[in-house]
C-alpha cells in the first residue's frame, strides 16, 4: 500500500453519504468553470502561434518527513516495541518496524525466487488479524461494492514442501560472483566481560563507565526470508560482517546462512507456514495487557534457590570463554589456497578427516573432507576434495586347461594369458557392457582360504570405469577359474593404492575448481584421478571444531512420534588432537527452546531471559528450532559432533523431525550437499551415519563401552563413574509441567546444557579423540568408523594395508546373513561352566583356552599368580603362525571334518621360513610400543608430549591384542579357522606344560585359566614368595624366545569357588617395605550387573568377612547377624528402592525377542520405548524392579521400571523375591566352601521358609555322597536326615506321634518308639493299634509314589525355581535345560533316589531286628526282656514288611 495524499483521504471518507442511498452517494459530474475554459483556449492559441509552452509547477506539500539516521533508528525501534494491535487474541501479529516500501523489496525478492508456473509470484501467507465486527448494510449498494472490491486470491501453496522447487532454488543460490572479496579476518563483537559461559547464570547488570554511551537496546535483524544467495556468500562467508549499513542495503537475510549469534525477531507462526522461520525477540518488552499473577523475577529466584540447582555454582573459568574472540572467516572459494609442493608446483594441501563414497549414485568417486590452512586468515577452514575416476580393478586367474562350461569337464587345450584376454574381450565385456577397459599381465601372491589357488601366479589385471556395474563374485569362465576384486569399493582401492593410513596431510596436484558446489565446506577442489593425491608425512594435525550437543524430546500423544523441544550445544573452535584437552573444553555455546504443540510458553518468559542476561533463543515451533540448529551447525561448521546415545536415538530422531517438518537444506547436518535424505531407522544406523558424512560422530556411549566397564552406560551412570558427580534426571512425564513457570523451563534448559557439558567432559576425561586418531593411524582405516567402535574393521584395514604392500591378492568381502537367533541366546554361560550351552547355541567352531580344574576352597597362605604377557600375539610370533606360512587343509575337506569330534590342527610352519606378514605386523606394533614407553621415561618431558606418548602406547596395545580376533571371528574378512585353532592349541599346550614344570618343582598348582596359573606357596613370608615367583618365571622363560611369563600378583588370601570365580586380597607392596591389600573379585555374582545392589553389598560384606583374619566362629557369627539385619530391613521397607534395581543388557532390539513376557528386561524396555523420551535398543542396559502387583504371575512377569513403582500406588517391592532369589543365591554360592554355613541356615537367617531350599541342598549332598564312595560310608542318621518323618495320630487322644527311629531316648531311658504315646497324659500304647498304623504307612507310601510319578521337574538355579511337568526339548550334557531361565538344568523335584531312600527310611524305622543287632549285648538283652517280646517283634516285622513289599517293586 502506497502513501495516500491528504485530499484523496477526504474524498475517500466522503464517498458514501449517511443516507446509505447508492444514488445519493454516487459521484456526480462537476461543471467546469468558464474561467477555466478561457484559459485553456488561450493556451491553445498561443501554441498554434508558435509560442513555447511553459509548465507551471505547483507547490506541493511533501508527504514524507525528513529525519536523520539516528532519529530514524529510534522511530523504527519504537514501532517494534509498540504493540499496536488491540485484542489480537495472542495470535502473534507482528510489526517489525520497517517502512511500507520495505515490503516491496521483500515482494520483489520473492518474485525472483518464488515465481510459479503461471508467471505470478506467490506471496507469503499472512495470519488473519481479528477485527471488530461490522454490521453489513442490507442494500444493493453493499453488494456492488463488495463485488467490485473482491480480488482473485491464489490458492495457498507451501513452497517448502516442493522438493523440485527446492532443488531449483538451490541451483539458483550458486551463482558465480563477478567480483570476489579478498579473504579478510573480521573479529566478532566481544561479549561483556561479566558474562558467564553458562547461559543460565544470573548476574547483576554492571554500571556503564562515564564517557561511554550505553545503547538501551541491541540491534535488531530483519525477519528471515529465503533469497537467492551469491556464490561468495554461500561458500565463503560463515556470517555477514556486522555493519549496519550493509545490512540495510541487503534488506533480507538468507535463512540457512544468517548470523544467528544476535537475538532475532520472531512470533508465533503457523505450523504449515513454509517460508519464514522466526525466533522470538529476546530483548522486546512483554506484551502489554497481560497480567502476571506473581512477580516473575522474584518467583524465579526463590524457586531456583530453594529447589533447582544453579549452574553458576560450577567451577567455570569465565575468563577463558569471555576472552575468546570468535573469528569469522570470509574466503574466496574461486581461488584455492595453493602452496608450493615438493616439486615447486602449486598444490592444494589439506588434512583429511573423513571420507565418503556413494557407490550407487556416484560410482568411482570418493569425497574427502578435512581442513585447509588459509594464510590470509591465519586459520584452518573446512574443505572437500572430490577424487574422480577410481577404476574397478579385477584379477583373473587363468586355468591350466580349458574347460567346457556346459559339462564342467576339462579339455586338452592349454590356456595362455591371451586366451583369458580374448574371452574377457569377446564374451565378458560384451555381456556386461564394458565398452572400454585396460589390461595387463601381473604376478600376484595368494595365501587365503579358497582352495586350488596357487601361492604365486600370473593374473590378468583388468581395469575399467566404476560406472559400469560390478561383475558377479562367483564368475567363472572357460579360461579362468576365479575373479578377485569384483566388489572392492572405490574407497578401499583409493586408500590402499595411495597408502593413506588414517587422517593425515595430503596434497592434490593440479586441483580443479568445481562448477557447482557439492558440499557445505568453505573450499572445494577436484582431483581428476587418484594418482594426483599424495601423502605428506610427519606434520602435526590441525585443531578441530568440536560441538557437543544434547537435546530433549517429548512424545506426541496423538501420533506417538518424538518431537524435539529444546537443544543446547557447546563448541570449541580449536580443539587439539595431539595435546591435552583444553580447559574449559568449550569456548562458545548456544541454546534454543521450542514448545510442544499443545503447550504455551510461560508468561514473561522472554522478560526473565532478558533480565537474567541469558543466551537462549526461543523458537515458536519445532520447525523453527530445527532450522535454527541447522543454521548454527552450518555457520560454526564443526568437524566432530559429540553426544550420548547419538547413534542409537538422537541422530535418528533429529533427522526424522527435520524430514517431518520439511526443514530446508537438511544435509547441513553433514558436509555433503544432498537433496534426498537416506533411509532412516535401519538397525545398523547406516542411513544416520551417511547423513552426517564429513562431520565425524563421537558417541561417548560407544567409546566408553570400549574403554571401561560400567554397570550400565546411561549418562547418569557415566557421570557418576567417570566425573565423580551426580546427574539429576528429569522424568519425561514432568517435562510438560516445566512450561508452567519460567523458572521451571529455565531449569529444564539448564539441565540440557549440563548434559552437553557432561558429555564433553567425559570425552575429554577419556581422551577419546586423540586415542581414536592414534588407533586409526595405526590401523589405516577411517576415523569416523573408529569412533563407531568395531575392532574387526580396524584389524581388517591393518591387514589389508600389509597384504597390499606385499603384492598379495586379498579376500573379497563376503555378504553374511546371520541366522535367526533363537530364544535365550542373550544369556550368559551358567556359572562359567563351558560344558553348559545356551539354548540354540551351536557348538564352538574350535577349542578355546584351557581352564584347569580348580581346587575349591579357602586359602589363607600367600597365593602366587603368574601370567603370560599377551599370550596369543606372542604365540603367533613365537611359532611364525600366518596365512603365508601355515599349510591348511582345503575348505571342502575342512567342512567334512567339522562335525567330527577330533579337531583338525594344522602343523606348525618350518622354523627356517621367513617371518610371515601377520607376526611381522604384530612385532611392529610391539616394538613401536616399547619405543614409545622408552620415550616416556625421558626426563623433563612436556606434559602434552607425555600424554601423547601414553595415548599412542595404549592404542598400540589395543590394536596388537585384538589382532588374533580376526582369525577366529567367522564374519571377519580374514577368517581362518585352522590358524585360530592352532593358536589356541599351542596356548593349551603351553599352559599344561607350565603346570607340569611347576609341579616338578614341588609346588601346588590350584588353578589355571588360558594364560595364567595360581600356585599355593604355603608361605606367609612375602619376600620368599617373590623369590619363588622369580625362580618359576626364569625356568619357564628359558623355553621360549618371545613368550614371557611374569608375576601378575600375590594374593594374601583366596576364596576359590569354581572355574573363573574367585575372590582374593591382592598384595600391593609399599615403598617402606610393607604392603597393603586390595580386594579383587572375578566372575562372582556381585560383579555382574544383573544382580541388585542390595545383593551385591551383602555379598561384598560376606566376602570381606571370609577374607579377613578373624576366626571361623567370629566370621559365621558376623554373617549371621548381618543377614538377620538385612532380612528385617527388607521386610520393614527401610531399604531404598535404588538398592532393588536390577540391570540387564539387551542383546537385540526389544521388539525382536520372541518371548517378551518371560524376559523382565525386555518387558520393561518395551514400556520405556512406549513412553518416549529415550529409546532403548540392542546393547543398552535396562533397570527394573520386581514388584507385588496383586497378580499371581511369576516374578519374571512382574518387572517394572523404577519410575513405574514411584507413580503407581498398587505396586510394592516383592520382598520375598529379593530375599529368596537375589540375596540368598549370592550368599549361598560364596559360602559354599565354608564349614558351618549352608543354604538352609542362610534361609533361616534371612527369615525365609527353609524347606524350599532343602531340595537344592539334597542334590548337593547327593553329589558329595558320590564323591565319598556312596551311602555305604554314611551313618543311618546322615543317610535319612532329609527324609520325611512318619507321622501317625494316636487313636486314643488324637496326638500326632512322629517316628524316625526304632528307639526313643538313649542309655538307660531307651525304649521302643511304639511303646507309648508322646502325650504324657495318654496311657494308650500305639503298639495296640497296629492296623491303623499299617494303613497310615501304606497311605504315606502311596502318596510318595504318586509324588514321584507326577514327574514334576524343578530348575536347580535358586533364582529361577521354575516347576514344570513337560520335559523340554533342549538338553545340555547335564540334563534338560530350563525353558524359563535357559541357564540351568531341570532336576526331578522328587527323584527316584529320593523315593527309594524314603522307602528305605520307612523300613528302617520299623526294622527292630536290625536295630537290636547294632546294640551292645547287655543293652540288647535288657530291651528284649523288658519291651521286645515275641509279640511286639512280630508287630514290628509286619509293619516293616509293608515297606519291604513296596521296595521289592522298585527293582
From Swiss-Prot:
Zn(2+) 1 binds at residues 1290, 1293, 1317, 1322. The modification N6-acetyllysine is found at residue 230. Residues 657-722, 1252-1383 are annotated as: DNA-binding. It is an enzyme of class 2 (transferase). GO terms for molecular function: chromatin binding; DNA binding; DNA replication origin binding; DNA-directed DNA polymerase activity; double-stranded DNA binding; nucleotide binding; protein kinase binding; purine nucleotide binding. Its EC number is 2.7.7.7. The modification Phosphoserine is found at residues 192, 196, 215. A motif (CysB motif) lies at residues 1355-1381. It is found in: Nucleus; Cytoplasm, Cytosol. Pfam families: DNA_pol_alpha_N, DNA_pol_B, DNA_pol_B_exo1, zf-DNA_Pol. PROSITE patterns: DNA_POLYMERASE_B. Keywords: Acetylation, Cytoplasm, DNA replication, DNA-binding, DNA-directed DNA polymerase, Metal-binding, Nucleotidyltransferase, Nucleus, Phosphoprotein, Transferase, Zinc, Zinc-finger. One of its GO terms (biological process) is regulation of type I interferon production. It catalyses: DNA(n) + a 2'-deoxyribonucleoside 5'-triphosphate = DNA(n+1) + diphosphate. In eukaryotes there are five DNA polymerases: alpha, beta, gamma, delta, and epsilon which are responsible for different reactions of DNA synthesis. Component of the alpha DNA polymerase complex (also known as the alpha DNA polymerase-primase complex) consisting of four subunits: the catalytic subunit POLA1, the regulatory subunit POLA2, and the primase complex subunits PRIM1 and PRIM2 respectively. Interacts with PARP1; this interaction functions as part of the control of replication fork progression. Interacts with MCM10 and WDHD1; these interactions recruit the polymerase alpha complex to the pre-replicative complex bound to DNA. Belongs to the DNA polymerase type-B family. This is DNA polymerase alpha catalytic subunit.
